[in-house]
Amino acid sequence: MAGARLLQEGRVSIVSFTLGASVISLPLLTSSFTEQTLLAAAPGRIALVFFIAALNGLLLLLYKAQLYQVAIRASFLGFAFGCGLLLSITQSPWKPFGWYVCSLSFFHYSEYLVTAMNNPRSLSIDSFLLNHSLEYTLAALSSWVEFTIETTIYPDLKQITWLSVIGLIMVLFGEVLRKCAMLTAGSNFNHIVQNEKSDSHTLVTSGVYSWFRHPSYVGWFYWSIGTQVLLCNPLCLVGYTLASWRFFSERIEEEEFSLIHFFGENYLEYKKKVPTGLPFIKGVKMEP
């Protein structure tokens, strides 16, 4: 029964994300709005408010309790994804921000969906990673503030299309690598570092794990940096790079203590052959 409930949550998330993303159809359904006026003009914003209210009402009718909590989060991410798409096809200086919103919303939604597919026993509302940490939230807010200020005082900085494209490629690479890592690890993957070995816990060394010891962290690292390259945010690019490097350095060391405890010599041999994948991060240092 638990498995069926969790699988249902995955299906609910797909439906809800799609409903939220359907906001992109508003300019197609009426000649009153274009992509630009829907997001920028007052009538368009009013239409978005009505869309959100109608969507929330529909979700309240369809789902109760825990399923509604899943649905409202997935639909919010879908709505953000749809608005990001609308923004990305405009000719405004905010076009790169549209790409960014699509990347951010899809990252959080796909974290939940892949967990539902891969490791339903660990699935929870927290699998969306929307409440990852205070530091994560502040980092996101900082990038939005920097983009807004620089767009206002120096809009040409945000018109370096080739740089934004490089950032988008980094984001896509990081996203694909992380999800490949999650799918390859299967039920071994968990958003929380495990300190106790479960009966089903095995050492995964195939697929992307034959390239890097920590491919999910490598993906997240380059995804994070790529978002700031995409936005042409020079200040946050430096900050994100340093903060991400420090976070993953500490996280990998913590995780590898557990992995050595779980798998002993097998992990030590694997560690000798395969790099972490992150620059200047070696993992746990073992005494000779």
From Swiss-Prot:
Record localization: Endoplasmic reticulum membrane
Spans within the Lumenal topological domain: 30-45, 92-96, 154-158, 233
Gene name of this polypeptide: icmt
Broad class of enzyme this protein falls into: transferase
Regions of this protein lying in the Cytoplasmic compartment: 64-73, 117-135, 179-216, 249-288
Function summary: Catalyzes the post-translational methylation of isoprenylated C-terminal cysteine residues.
Positions that bind substrate: R251
Protein name as annotated: Protein-S-isoprenylcysteine O-methyltransferase
Catalytically driven reaction(s): [protein]-C-terminal S-[(2E,6E)-farnesyl]-L-cysteine + S-adenosyl-L-methionine = [protein]-C-terminal S-[(2E,6E)-farnesyl]-L-cysteine methyl ester + S-adenosyl-L-homocysteine
Family affiliation: Belongs to the class VI-like SAM-binding methyltransferase superfamily. Isoprenylcysteine carboxyl methyltransferase family.
EC number per UniProt: 2.1.1.100
